[in-house]
């Protein structure tokens, strides 16, 4: 998955312990996959939203002026076996030819938070030049109009990256990835309180037991209040691995747990999503026997 080169996506130790999943866990590659990227699947009110390349009528990916692919969010029909059918691109006049990706949704499906690009160049102290960093926006769904009222979250400083938003089940906390001052790894996990999807509290970095000296990306909070995220920290199975952390824990020394195979693989595994039944969901992966890009996989018996 590639976003604009100057819009560093940053997806891309803490000792990891084996997270013992049942040997019956089943993971299958979805039929919707092809040589393009498919990732960040989320189920909302019986429909599946996911991110993929914007494409032309001939099926080729659309690129920007930097020759990098543009991404959009698609909505499909959820089949009983987890397959995604009849995908359609979410259309909005406020989102034409822009990267819109890695979204999270309120339970009622009325609000969407997603990753996009700054339109104002920020300072990149490492590269000593201005870059267009990533930001988080919020949109509202209005019947008959679709997704409207695109708003950049007020704490998104153009000098830093803000990406991969994830709402808590009750909608009062937004988790995300950032590179703001105070980040100890290449990208860390943060959170902020949310009130009525209009006002936001103080940005707080998650603890050092969760963040590492490497990259943390794609957070997700399940219905039982467990935080899932991907990291390339030491001790993994290869590339990006998916980890779990119980947000209900009172143990300040508790460390994230690496998920076992077949959820994690020797390739990059990221963008974990678990349905409210706590047994089925989706992951994205670049593993062996894939279709060539980021592929979507459906898992069951978790």
Set out the residue ranges of the language-model regions:
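Bacterial Sec-dependent N-terminal signal peptides
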Residues: 1-23
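Short, conserved micro-motifs composed of acidic
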Residues: 21-302
């Amino acid at each position: 998955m590639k976003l604009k080169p100057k819009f560093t996506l940053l997806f891309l130790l803490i000792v990891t312990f084996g997270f013992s999943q049942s040997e019956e866990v089943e993971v299958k590659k979805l039929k919707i996959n092809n040589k393009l990227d498919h990732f960040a699947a989320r189920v909302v009110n019986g429909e599946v939203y996911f991110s993929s390349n914007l494409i032309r009528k001939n099926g080729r990916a659309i690129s920007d002026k930097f020759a990098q692919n543009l991404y959009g969010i698609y909505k499909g029909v959820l089949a009983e076996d987890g397959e995604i059918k009849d995908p359609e691109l979410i259309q909005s006049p406020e989102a034409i030819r822009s990267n819109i990706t890695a979204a999270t949704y309120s339970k009622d499906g009325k609000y969407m938070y997603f990753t996009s690009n700054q339109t104002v160049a920020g300072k990149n102290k490492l590269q000593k030049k201005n870059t267009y960093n990533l930001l988080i926006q919020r949109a509202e769904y209005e019947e008959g109009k679709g997704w409207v009222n695109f708003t950049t979250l007020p704490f998104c400083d153009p000098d830093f990256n803000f990406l991969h938003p994830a709402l808590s089940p009750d909608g009062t906390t937004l988790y995300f990835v950032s590179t703001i001052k105070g980040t100890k790894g290449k990208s860390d996990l943060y959170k902020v309180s949310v009130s009525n999807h209009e006002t936001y509290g103080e940005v707080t970095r998650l603890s050092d037991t969760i963040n590492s000296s490497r990259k943390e990306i794609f957070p997700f909070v399940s219905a039982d209040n467990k935080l899932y995220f991907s990291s390339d920290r030491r001790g993994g199975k290869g590339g990006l691995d998916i980890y779990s952390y119980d947000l209900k824990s009172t143990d300040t020394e508790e460390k994230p747990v690496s998920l076992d195979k077949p959820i994690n693989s020797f390739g990059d595994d990221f963008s974990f999503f678990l349905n409210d039944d706590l047994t089925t969901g989706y992951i994205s992966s670049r593993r062996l026997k894939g279709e060539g890009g980021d592929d979507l996989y459906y898992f069951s018996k978790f």
